[in-house]
Amino acid sequence: MDLQAINSNFKNFLEEVGSYYSVVDDQEVQILRKKQDDCYQNFLDVHYEYTKCISQIDDKYSSLNKTFKFKTEKAAKSYKSCLQNKKVEECHERTWKHLHENMKQYISLLRRIDTQTIKY
């Protein structure tokens, strides 16, 4: 065998080996890319659920705060109208009783929302 034939055979061998490794690399890269895409999709799904949950919790806090503000304003108006007809002590006691009940409900609902937040 002459030197040119040996070089040609060796070159063909290297190309064959190279093509084998490029196929293996391509397959491994495709597998890794698939895993990466799956992970990214899972991340997007989890992120979407988390964002949706946070939005719902924000809505609940907002609604709860509006309700509490409304009840507090209602109690203040009730206190003013009460003062026109009754003694200050009687109005004061009645108003504080309403405000205390409102505050207990508010705290109870806040705890319930916080419990839901912890679940996520």
Regions found by a protein language model. Give the residues of each.
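Mitochondrial intermembrane space
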Residues: 1-120
